Design a protein with these regions (language model features):
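Charge-rich, low-complexity N-terminal segments
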Residues: 1-55, 61-121
Length: 121
């Protein structure tokens, strides 16, 4: 389910997955040439597309979770450069605006796992 309880369309999922794969390759090969960012250690965990496909909420996690807030802020700062590099990889009429967000799902899962372990003792 998407925002406001609307189901996510197949097109949103397909475009989100396409952008996720392209961004992963851009970061892995360091194609965007971003200063002061070690892009090889950035994992793109999920990309959620808006219903109009104009915005891509991109969940990222730096390797080891070290300096994750600083890395996300740097990605936000250089999102134009990343978007320009992405436009060379993906053929779309309108390339979506990239919003980078720190993925906290792994931290949340670890917290839940620890709570379950405590209750089982």
């Amino acid at each position: 389910m998407g925002k406001l309880g609307k189901p996510v369309t197949q097109r949103q999922l397909r475009v989100g997955e396409m952008i996720k794969q392209a961004l992963s390759m851009i970061f892995l090969k360091d194609e965007a040439k971003l200063p002061n960012i070690q892009t090889k250690g950035i994992t793109v965990t999920e990309v959620r597309m808006s219903p109009d496909l104009k915005t891509a909420k991109t969940f990222v996690l730096p390797l080891g979770g070290i300096n994750s807030d600083e890395t996300v802020e740097s990605l936000k700062e250089f999102s134009f450069v990343i978007r320009k590099t992405l436009s060379r990889k993906i053929n779309m009429k309108f390339l979506p605006k990239l919003l980078f967000v720190k993925d906290e799902s792994f931290d949340y899962a670890e917290k839940i796992e620890n709570l379950i372990k405590q209750t089982n003792k």
